[in-house]
Swiss-Prot record, chain A:
InterPro entries: DAD/Ost2 (IPR003038). Belongs to the DAD/OST2 family. It holds the Pfam family DAD. It comes from the Eukaryota. GO terms for cellular component: oligosaccharyltransferase complex. It comes from Citrus unshiu. Keywords: Apoptosis, Endoplasmic reticulum, Membrane, Transmembrane, Transmembrane helix. This is Dolichyl-diphosphooligosaccharide--protein glycosyltransferase subunit DAD1. It is found in: Endoplasmic reticulum membrane. It is a multi-pass membrane protein. Residues 1-31, 77-94 are cytoplasmic. The chain crosses the membrane at residues 32-52, 56-76, 95-115.
Length: 115, 433
């Protein structure tokens, strides 16, 4: 019984890997970017847990920049993905332009709040 | 002719304004009204009155039931202090009564009341208004069978020799009174809840208050050192009152020998005791004034209208003591200033430069609001100082916070790395196939 679930998990993992290898490179680059943002956010949370939250506004600003970046990148990935029926009529340039503008606003806010 | 008369009356009515009198610049009393039962007191108490006039007081003697006496005329007080040496008066003459005496003290003037073994109800009422309760038994006197004064005839031990003085240099002077003080009269008690009265001379623990001519039928109500022979009251407006139960204490006295001790003093302690305590009552000693309250930020010299939290500021005040003729610097190491808003956030002892200038430096607390600089100084025998100056304190402005903190470098780093990552990502995203 355990052996079959172990084999099932392995089979699941293999199918996920092969399916993921089939995604277009563009989306893989966006996934990498999101992973980088989340990783940076995790580093900051661990730092705050060690040192304490003294300049709390700086902590919030740093974490929010990472989280905001990740969220905007995920939105871009959703809109650019050709397999997505909902955004079939949206030109990818329009999605990219939205992404750039939102990031500009995000970084403006972050710089103001960074202290 | 009418014009001449007019000018004459105008000129004479202006003369009282030029007389040197009681004022905040010169707090010692000058004009003293002495009410007596009969003018023989002038000669039997001549030493005491002589010591007063030699210090510059203008004494005016009147009989207590003289119909022309009055403390004030047209709303202005005619005298700076009142001395009641009339223990047996039933009704004051003129416009004086208990209410006017109480008003006189309430307006800041001083009072000396001396009762005696035949004290009337009126004098007892005046004393009760001042916070002191004489023994209710009208025939009682203070008797002490152990600390009486030795005399040539076999007395009934009502003349007692007492040396139980209060320990206060400001009230009794710095020189120790060697000889005991002779006292013959009624005793009084003080309410222990009253914080304004002080026992200057108390009876010894073997004294009691009873009628010397009759046998004791029940135990006396006033005994021991609860009996006060001489008390002083310093009111909240700094008026000073001296109350004692023996008019003969002020009279000219000779030597004294306490029973049970072999020392025979040539002179009793009465003269020194009464001189020193009169100096205190008439504000020749122990009268403080605080002037020149200033506060400013450390490093600047002008007084700001508002402080910011976590500012360093300095507070200074000058305190002087009246020496009888001039203002001398007051030197003490226990004057404190509070930075107060509902409760003191900062309490600091002021340091002095020995010339009457007190100052302290402290940091404004991390709380904003409207604060007060408060100095509340109440010490035994000194006038109370109550200074208060209001000052608001504001929080940081938006651009006054600390920037570039080393503790926040990781957060700065992550924000900038996110911006760099975004820039690189846009290039890669646009130019990858």
């Amino acid at each position: 019984m355990a052996r079959s679930t172990g084999k099932d998990a392995q089979a699941l993992f293999h199918s996920l890997r092969s399916a993921y290898a089939a995604t277009p490179t563009t989306l893989k680059i966006i996934d990498l970017y999101v992973g980088f943002a989340v990783f940076t956010a995790l580093i900051q949370v661990v730092y705050m847990a060690i040192v304490g939250s003294f300049p709390f506004n700086s902590f919030l600003s740093g974490v929010l920049s990472c989280v905001g970046t990740a969220v905007l990148a995920v939105c871009l990935r959703i809109q650019v993905n050709k397999d997505n029926k909902e955004f079939k009529d949206l030109p990818p340039e329009r999605a990219f332009a939205d992404f750039v503008l939102c990031n500009l606003v995000l970084h403006l806010v972050i710089m103001n709040f960074l202290g | 002719m009418a014009k001449l008369l007019l000018y004459l009356t105008l000129a004479t009515s202006l003369i009282p304004l030029f007389s040197v009198a009681f004022s905040p610049e010169n707090p010692t009393d000058r004009r003293v009204l002495v009410l007596v039962d009969d003018f023989a007191i002038k000669s039997s108490h001549s030493l005491y009155f002589g010591s007063l006039t030699s210090r510059g007081f203008q004494l005016e003697f009147k009989l207590a039931d003289d119909p022309n006496i009055g403390l004030q005329r047209y709303g202005q007080y005619l005298y700076d202090a009142l001395v009641l040496f009339c223990p047996s008066v039933e009704r004051f003459g003129g416009s004086i009564d208990v209410a006017s005496i109480v008003d006189f003290v309430d307006s800041g003037h001083d009072l000396i009341v001396a009762a005696d073994s035949n004290a009337s109800d009126l004098i007892r009422e005046v004393a009760t208004e001042c916070g002191v309760d004489f023994d209710e038994d009208p025939a009682a006197m203070v008797i002490d069978h152990i600390n009486y004064a030795v005399s040539n005839f076999d007395g009934d031990h009502t003349l007692i020799a007492s040396d139980d003085f209060i320990k206060a240099d400001v009230i009794l002077g710095s020189k120790k009174i060697e000889a005991p003080v002779l006292f013959q009269g009624i005793g009084h008690s003080l309410n222990p809840a009253n914080s304004l009265v002080l026992k200057v001379l108390s009876a010894s623990s073997s004294a009691y208050s009873a009628n010397p001519k009759s046998k004791l039928s029940n135990p006396p109500s006033l005994t021991g050192s609860a009996i006060s022979l001489v008390s002083v009251v310093q009111a909240r407006n700094n008026a000073r009152i001296l109350i004692t139960g023996s008019l003969s204490m002020f009279s000219n006295r000779s030597g004294v020998q306490k029973a049970g001790s072999s020392i025979k003093h040539e002179k009793s302690g009465n003269e020194q005791f009464l001189t020193e305590i009169s100096k205190w009552v008439f504000h020749e000693r122990g009268h403080l004034k605080a002037v020149n309250v200033r506060h400013h930020k450390v490093g600047e010299s002008d007084e700001p209208a508002i402080y910011r939290i976590n500012d360093d500021l300095e507070y200074s005040v000058e305190i002087y003591e009246w020496s009888g003729t001039s203002w001398e610097p007051y030197v003490s190491d226990d004057v404190q200033v509070q930075f107060y808003m509902m409760s003191p956030y900062v309490l600091k002892t002021l340091s002095t430069d020995q010339k009457g200038h007190y100052s302290a430096e402290f940091k404004v607390p991390d709380v904003y609001g409207v604060f007060q600089f408060k100095v509340e100084y109440q010490r035994l025998g000194y006038t109370s100082l109550s200074l208060s100056k209001q000052i608001p304190v504001r929080p940081y402005r938006h651009n006054e916070y600390e920037r570039f903190l080393p503790a926040a470098y990781p957060y700065y780093g992550s924000a900038f790395s996110m911006m760099a990552g975004f820039f690189i990502f846009t290039i890669v995203h646009l130019y990858s196939k």
